[in-house]
Amino acid sequence: MRIWFKKVPDGITSSVILSEDHLVDDLKDAIARKFPIRISQYYDAPELSIRVVAPPNASSELQSRELSPNESILFVMETYYPHGQDFNDALLVASPDTSVALRYRSSQLSSSTFESTPPVFSEYPPNIIPTPANETVPRIKQPSIALDSLESPVSAPSRHQSTYSYKGGPLNYNLRNASRTRSHQTLPSSNVNKTGVLLLPRSSRQQTLASRPSLPDLTSADKSQPSDEAESITRKNSIGMSTRSDESTAEKLAKAEVATPTNSRSISHSSLYTKQSGTAGVLPAVNADIDAANRMNPDISSQFPIADNKDPLNADTQAHLGFPSNQIDGIVGTSPVNVLTSPGIGAKAPFASLLEGVIPPINVLIVEDNIINQKILETFMKKRNISSEVAKDGLEALEKWKKKSFHLILMDIQLPTMSGIEVTQEIRRLERLNAIGVGAPKLTQPIPEKDQLNENKFQSPVIIVALTASSLMADRNEALAAGCNDFLTKPVSLVWLEKKITEWGCMQALIDWNGWCRFRGR
């Protein structure tokens, strides 16, 4: 049995299918399931109110009323609609925010009215439509629209058309959209006068600090003009870049030198980013503007003293850190960008980056039967100066691991002769048998000769990472239960793999520090 209902006040008409033994309470549950966002997200099903409307040609005994939860749907349909309920005889469903005592205007009820426009009620609460949970637009107070002031049925259609939009939705829904547009348009204007925060590099921060205009000296009128000129130069270059102007920077510097005597102890900010040999710095335009600001503000050197960098590290400090004296001399006065290219620093390895002294270079075993994947991983390791070997099947991987200890094994699960799960289980069995690892219990029984491992090569359990194209949780649990430390699903991002290798390498270096030092040749 199909039951038609109309959701008020938006006038959405829909239907549900119920059996003859269902009650009104079951109808409320079906309606709540029909509208999981607009009703179920905000109200419970028993909170809904269902109102039956008497047909225009019905007897005077039948009146519009609210249905009780324990009433039979079959009895209501046979009483009010003996010839069957159609689209125009829909029940009225209201939420708790809607007034229960909705007085239906029978004079407005007709087939054309129902097809063209939703019904008009005497009481129309304005804020009925709930806002979805993912809508972040703040709620505003909307103007209420009174519909009880209708005096004649003739004015009802015009008033009703002004209430509903062209899409059939209520007016307050359009008001919300309009307010959202207005609020979005007014957002930029509200932040015009607010001061923003700009994160600048070190040179720009020092420039901004050094270029603050000092307090005007009332005893000397000649110093005010250079201060104003310095302020204008600073305003043009406050973001760390030199801009063009009608007057060149050299002319401004010349005027500044004539107007203000040069301080012999001015701060040499450019020495922090340039070489002492007199070569050009990283930002020559910025350094020139900083020097100009220093000449115009000689008191800054006393407020922010900078230590002389001729002797940054004494002999005791150099000996304690283990740096040769020639390397320290090469670092002094060198730009941070060119530190790796300085003599004795960063030029000894192809993987020349700031992470050279941080990432432990580990030895990786790649177990992969696909030739393309082998070449990709091999090239990836070579570019990052990571020592690696390749095994084509599980048996070859097990033999290579026995002969040479590895820090990390990238294990493919689907392998010929021996699967990755079987190889992992065998490796963990041999590690337990030979008591590899900190705190591993040693067996009292003698170890078979084929299962014995070199104690000098194996100091800690190897990190095994499973690689597979399957994303099933069962495969992941099986790999972790076999002894894998991590589980990666193909295709793997090389950028993310590099981060994980860094993590695993640092972890292995901490676990087996002595073995890693031997691997480094220390």
UniProtKB/Swiss-Prot annotation:
Q: Which GO terms describe its biological process?
A: negative regulation of G2/M transition of mitotic cell cycle; phosphorelay signal transduction system; positive regulation of p38MAPK cascade
Response regulatory domain: residues covered: 363-505
This protein's UniProt keywords: Cytoplasm, Phosphoprotein, Two-component regulatory system
Gene Ontology molecular function, alphabetical:
phosphorelay response regulator activity; protein kinase activator activity
Modified-residue entries (4-aspartylphosphate), positions: D412
Instruction: Spell out the InterPro entries in the cross-references.
Output: CheY-like_superfamily, Sig_transdc_resp-reg_receiver
Q: Where in the cell is it found?
A: Cytoplasm
Q: What does this protein do?
A: Response regulator that coordinately controls the stress activated wak1-wis1-sty1 MAP kinase pathway and fission yeast cell cycle.
Give the protein's recorded name.
Response regulator mcs4
Q: Which gene encodes it?
A: mcs4
